[in-house]
Amino acid sequence: LLNILCGSIPLDGGDVLVNGKSIRKQKDFQRYATIGRVYQNPSLGTCPNLTMLENLSLADNKGKRFGLGFGVNKKRIDAYRAELAALGLGLEDKLDVKMGALSGGQRQAVALLMATMTPLNFLILDEHTAALDPKTAETIMELTGKVVRGKGLTAMMVTHNLRYAVEYGDRLLMLDHGTIVLDRAGKEKEATSTEELLQVFNRYSIL
């Protein structure tokens, strides 16, 4: 589903509408201008040989016409520091550190920030905590909820952690071989428990 949204997999039929407009025929660069994505692998979505400052600057200029006016200046550096400080991980003092030297959790936190620096139609979270240890995964999920709600974003998250789905999701979809087998929102979603989701999951996983 995510790859269809991003254009990596062509549609066999139907259409993809974003804000009521079809994006089926859009080129990849056109789609990504208003789509943010955080990948499962912390090594993706950032440039390991560039500093955090350089990575943030690239993300900040996404979809913009480049020119001398888009270089890093003190005002931008101060803004990046403020954004990083808001994450509460002490990253604001590591702007000159290369991304490859950061831990997986730190990289995912920066990747989340980078993915949401410019205006978005929606944010894709592609199992973005799956490669992290449990404690770090909890931290990244808390940050994700804070960023998504703080910026008023529409986000689509793929996860095998059913508790995360129930705790953070406003609408729950469960797919089995590309077919939606569960779709709950509103009061129905609020009444859904992790245990109930697990029962549905197990029902299809043994087929």
Model feature map: region roles:
Residues 6:
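Helix-to-loop junction immediately C-terminal to a conserved catalytic motif
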Residues 11-22, 184:
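Conserved ABC transporter NBD signature motif
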Residues 22-36, 66, 73, 189-197:
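ABC ATPase NBD coupling module
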Residues 115-116:
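ABC ATPase C-loop
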